[in-house]
Amino acid sequence: MKTFRYVSGLPEKIKLEKFEVDGKRTYILPSGKHVPSITTVLGHFKKASIAQWRNRVGAEEANRVSSKAAGRGTRYHNMVERYLENQPLEKVITESTMPDLREMFKIAQPTIDRIDNIHYVECPLFSEVLGIAGRCDLIAELDGKLSIIDHKTSTKEKKEDW
């Protein structure tokens, strides 16, 4: 198993206060400016297609699929975090780990193993200029290049033009 290294001596992560306004996540930047989350901004572009999908499959099925996807994402993120914390593989993938998550992790593991020199985990990011904020899963080196990394668990490949 790979041992991940963490970079020491970095500044403390900035803490951004977040709250909901009309069901939309908003952050308060260090300057005091209130900005929407990047997820909220991007969500405006998806609303029509999500509404069409919900109408096509029905509310009950849409809620079931959405709930399953959210749960899978949370469990997968927890697995990856344990792995990046250098926990033994048997603590990352346990007997209770669902088969789909086992498979997802096994597929992703070679890519995850290309990560090193971890700077931050679950890190807030923001732009005063763009007026947005959010969180990334990881700031670390991927193949030796400092990168912003966000773990994705979609079961469908996204089109390049999305």
Tell me the role of every PLM-derived stretch.
Residues M1-A133:
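Metal-dependent nuclease catalytic cores that hydrolyze phosphodiester bonds in DNA/RNA
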Residues H119-W162:
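Mg2+/Mn2+-dependent nuclease catalytic core
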